[in-house]
Amino acid sequence: MDLPGPIHDFLLVFLGSGLLVGGLGVVLLPNPIFSAFSLGFVLFCISLLYILSNSHFVAAAQLLIYVGAINVLIIFAVMFMNDSEYSTDFNLWTVGNGITSLVCTTILFSLLSTILDTSWYGVIWTTRLNQILEQDLISNSQQIGIHLSTDFFLPFELISIILLVALIGAISVARQ
């Protein structure tokens, strides 16, 4: 950010003190849930420091990956492991599980048949790819966005499907 010197210094000291307080909270708080939330605050302050140093894409990646995914995973694991009571009436198979597995299997086979029957060499991702890349793009974020939406579109979408399946699996494990 292009800020005047005193404002930049104030924000730097404010975020640094937030990092110190959050780090002390991670180490000193006795409840692991509060420690995990404090870790999320530390990671959020780090992303704000990236914004302060004009690294906007790194800040967005920090928020999405570390605060949004890793910290949520840590909180999920802590909450899952703190449950000392185990359910004694655990049903291995219910009607809902059968319906869900039937729907998921149908979707899987329809996706597999679509993927195998499609001629991927004939697909034109975009007609203006060379024109877009020849332009002077303003930032690295725009270049990454162009490559994700053209060259790496299919792997990007496959990763999003894998993450969706992992999220659904985590929710189903947490509900049991």
From Swiss-Prot:
It is a multi-pass membrane protein. Pfam families: Oxidored_q3. Keywords: Chloroplast, Membrane, NAD, NADP, Plastid, Plastoquinone, Quinone, Thylakoid, Translocase, Transmembrane, Transmembrane helix, Transport. The keyword Membrane applies. One of its GO terms (cellular component) is chloroplast thylakoid membrane. It comes from the Eukaryota. Its EC number is 7.1.1.-. It catalyses: a plastoquinone + NADH + (n+1) H(+)(in) = a plastoquinol + NAD(+) + n H(+)(out); a plastoquinone + NADPH + (n+1) H(+)(in) = a plastoquinol + NADP(+) + n H(+)(out). The chain crosses the membrane at residues 10-30, 32-52, 61-81, 92-112, 152-172. NDH shuttles electrons from NAD(P)H:plastoquinone, via FMN and iron-sulfur (Fe-S) centers, to quinones in the photosynthetic chain and possibly in a chloroplast respiratory chain. The immediate electron acceptor for the enzyme in this species is believed to be plastoquinone. Couples the redox reaction to proton translocation, and thus conserves the redox energy in a proton gradient. Belongs to the complex I subunit 6 family. This is NAD(P)H-quinone oxidoreductase subunit 6, chloroplastic. It comes from Lepidium virginicum (Virginia pepperweed). The lineage of its organism: Eukaryota, Viridiplantae, Streptophyta, Embryophyta, Tracheophyta.
